Curated annotation (Swiss-Prot):
Gene that this polypeptide is encoded by: rplQ
Keyword check for Coiled coil: no
Gene3D superfamilies for this protein: Ribosomal protein L17
GO cellular component, as recorded: cytosolic large ribosomal subunit
InterPro entries: Ribosomal_bL17, Ribosomal_bL17_CS, Ribosomal_bL17_sf
Highest taxon listed in the record's lineage: Bacteria
Protein name: Large ribosomal subunit protein bL17
A single MF term (Gene Ontology): structural constituent of ribosome
Family: Belongs to the bacterial ribosomal protein bL17 family.
Membrane-spanning intervals of the chain: none
Species, as recorded: Herminiimonas arsenicoxydans
A Gene Ontology BP annotation from the UniProt entry: translation
Amino acid sequence: MRHRHGLRKLNRTSSHRLAMLRNMTVSLLRHEAIKTTLPKAKELRRVIEPILTLGKTDSLANKRLAFNRLRDREMVVKLFAELGPRYANRNGGYLRILKMGFRAGDNAPMAFIELLDRPETTEAVEDNSGE
């Protein structure tokens, strides 16, 4: 019996799927929030949560494992310097997936996936159109 071996196929070849998930992981770590389809967001959660858990323990072995999965030196540094300490007291559940309705072109279910406890970037935008 199969019983949950592997990832969702997402209608892609194995190499395309792994490259897409790696790129989405790096994008999520860089921007801390991205918009994607709901099945991709659910699959991304299964990929990125163990990587964030690696970032909680700062060791050479964990850095090598993270680089092996991310292939982006800048994101490995951010993972261990910023994200690891941020989630030191949290045992899993580092992400939030919010449903956003459906895409206009193909009616695909869309989702907003973001890291929890991210710093607020509330910048007031001045309206100069009235002058």
